[in-house]
Amino acid sequence: MSKTELLDRWTIEKSEELYGIHNWGAGYFSISNQGEVLINPFRDTPEAAVSLIDIISGIRERGMEMPVLLRFENILDSQLSYLNESFAEAIATLGYQGVYRGVYPVKVNQQQQVIEEVIRFGQRYHHGLEVGSKAELIAALSVMKDQEACLICNGYKDEEFIDLGLYAVKMGFKL
């Protein structure tokens, strides 16, 4: 079979299957009828979708070269909402008397912009952070302002780590 014949038989569905986009895209990524990867920043909202090719073209028009790191705050915000609202729904359905306080494990992505967005958007849910090192604890203390949010300290605790944690408690944080 020639390359042309193969391409003539190729479908969007075959691209979706080949790349497993339904397995990892979670409604935030899809493939257009033109075969381009689309970013759906508000999950399953095709009217808000943006072509990855258009994003790359815009980046190049600004004189930037590849590779670049693309960060979609809307996706992070949407996932924080989904997580917290799912727990709120389960709590209400089951008549649970406690509250849910989510925490973001800093080790997953320590980039300042990500941590700041988790804190900024997550404040409505009192979403906190989980840290496992002195550096992470110091970073968390510098951005956390909501004293209803939890700050979870995991990992090896030397005297300095414990002192930092005790100072955080004095500052009003829940550890």
Residue ranges of model-derived segments:
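N-terminal start-of-chain detector that recognizes signal peptides
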Residues: S2, D8-T11, N74-D77, G102, ...
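N-terminal basic/disordered segments at the start of proteins
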Residues: S2-T45
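A short linear-motif detector with a strong N-terminal bias
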Residues: L7-W10, E16-L18, P46-A48, S81-L83, ...
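Short secondary-structure boundary micro-motifs
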Residues: T11-K14, G20-H22, S51-I53, G58-I59, ...
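Short, flexible coil/linker segments at or flanking structured domains
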Residues: E17-Y19, M64, L94, Y125
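A general structural signal for short secondary-structure junctions and capping/turn motifs
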Residues: L18-I21, G27-S30, G58-E61, S142-M144, ...
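Low-complexity, highly charged intrinsically disordered N-terminal segments
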Residues: S32-Q110
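Active-site-proximal beta-alpha core segment in soluble small-molecule metabolic enzymes
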Residues: G95-L175
